[in-house]
């Protein structure tokens, strides 16, 4: 959270406030951004699946209108969440990232996973409830580790076939049941590039709402092994000198922060700050 944005469970029965609208194509925007007067937005011809009270931005209540489909609204368009992450007001991006996670979770938990009956929102906590099963479902968060492996002035970067052409990044992967973040790190590095690491240090974390990851950032030192790329997962992996790096991930991502932080420390430059 930030001084401007705090999440909260708000009753949609209350009036007023701001609202954001999310469709399969992203968030509704106009020349002023993605926040709209709630009363005005609810008067538009929108196919609303559900409404969620999600928190306060600059002291004002904020609600999410989760839509079944995209609609035409005069003077407005639709914009994907990633573009908000890359540029603009980062506090607003956090509002939209939270909204996206809540909208995705509630959409995917409309029916009980045990008995198949419809679930209802609990008004006093962020949960969906099945009365026949007495079962609560809470928002999903998927812990993932992301690590910069270093060897003196060299850093180990890789690229996936899914990356933007030419871009290299740090190694990352989801934690498995029963694993610590450190266990996950060692396993993922070994699986993806067949390298062993040591001196694992936690650096920081970042919410990654695509759709519901929590990125746990680490630095680790190379301990041994030759790079062997995991088929279908790693397109290329190699050591790069900190003074001769390839195209890198977006500046607001934790992947870029891990790289920039290490380069700054090796070069005696001011350390960057991780956007939170």
From Swiss-Prot:
Q: Which residues bind substrate?
A: 82, 125, 138, 206-213, 255
Q: Metal-binding among the record's keywords?
A: yes
Query: What domain of life?
Result: Bacteria
Spell out where the chain crosses the membrane: none
CDD domains, per the entry: NUDIX_NADH_pyrophosphatase_Nudt13
Q: Which UniProt keywords apply?
A: Hydrolase, Magnesium, Manganese, Metal-binding, NAD, Zinc
Q: Which Gene3D superfamilies match?
A: 3.90.79.20, Nucleoside Triphosphate Pyrophosphohydrolase
Instruction: Kindly list the positions annotated as binding a divalent metal cation 1.
Output: 172, 192, 233
PROSITE patterns, A to Z: NUDIX
Q: What is its EC number?
A: 3.6.1.-, 3.6.1.22
- Which Pfam families does the entry link to? NUDIX (PF00293), NUDIX-like (PF09296), Zn_ribbon_NUD (PF09297)
Locate the residues binding Zn(2+).
112, 115, 130, 133
Is Metal-binding found in the keyword set? yes
Record's GO cellular component terms = cytosol
Q: Which residues does the record give as a divalent metal cation 3 binding sites?
A: 188, 192, 233
- List, in alphabetical order, the Gene Ontology terms for molecular function in this entry: magnesium ion binding; manganese ion binding; NAD+ diphosphatase activity; NADH pyrophosphatase activity; RNA NAD-cap (NMN-forming) hydrolase activity; zinc ion binding
Residue window of motif Nudix box = 173-194
Q: Which residues form the Nudix hydrolase domain?
A: 139-262
Indicate which residues the UniProt annotation says bind a divalent metal cation 2.
188
Please report which protein family the annotation says this sequence is part of.
Belongs to the Nudix hydrolase family. NudC subfamily.
What does the record note on quaternary structure? Homodimer.
Q: What is the documented function of this protein?
A: mRNA decapping enzyme that specifically removes the nicotinamide adenine dinucleotide (NAD) cap from a subset of mRNAs by hydrolyzing the diphosphate linkage to produce nicotinamide mononucleotide (NMN) and 5' monophosphate mRNA. The NAD-cap is present at the 5'-end of some mRNAs and stabilizes RNA against 5'-processing. Has preference for mRNAs with a 5'-end purine. Catalyzes the hydrolysis of a broad range of dinucleotide pyrophosphates.
Protein's name according to its UniProt entry: NAD-capped RNA hydrolase NudC
Query: Whose protein is this, by species?
Result: Pseudomonas putida (strain W619)
Please state the gene responsible for encoding this protein.
Answer: nudC
């Amino acid at each position: 959270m930030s001084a401007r944005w705090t999440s909260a469970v708000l009753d949609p029965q209350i009036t007023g406030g701001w609202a954001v609208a999310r469709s399969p194509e992203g968030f509704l925007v106009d020349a002023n951004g993605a926040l709209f007067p709630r009363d005005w937005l609810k008067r538009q011809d929108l196919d609303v699946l559900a409404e969620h009270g999600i928190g306060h931005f600059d002291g004002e209540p904020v609600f999410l209108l989760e839509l079944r489909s995209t609609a035409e609204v005069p003077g407005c368009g639709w914009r994907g969440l990633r573009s908000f992450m890359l540029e603009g007001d980062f506090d607003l991006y956090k509002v939209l990232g939270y909204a996206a996670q809540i909208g995705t979770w509630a959409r995917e938990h409309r029916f009980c996973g045990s008995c198949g009956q419809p679930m209802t929102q609990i008004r006093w906590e962020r949960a969906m409830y099945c009365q026949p099963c007495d079962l609560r479902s809470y928002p999903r968060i998927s812990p993932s580790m992301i690590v910069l492996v270093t060897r003196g002035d060299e850093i180990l970067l890789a690229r996936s076939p899914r990356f933007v052409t030419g871009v290299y990044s740090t190694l990352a992967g989801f934690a498995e049941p029963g694993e610590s973040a450190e266990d996950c790190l060692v396993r993922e590095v070994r699986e993806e590039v067949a390298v062993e690491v040591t001196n694992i240090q936690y650096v920081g974390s970042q919410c990654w709402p695509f759709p519901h990851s929590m990125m746990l950032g680490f630095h680790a030192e190379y301990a041994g092994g030759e790079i062997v790329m995991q088929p279908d997962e790693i397109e290329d992996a190699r050591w790069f000198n900190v003074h001769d790096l390839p195209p890198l991930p977006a500046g607001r991502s934790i992947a870029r922060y891990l790289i920039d932080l290490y380069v700054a420390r090796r070069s005696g430059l001011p350390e960057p700050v991780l956007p939170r």
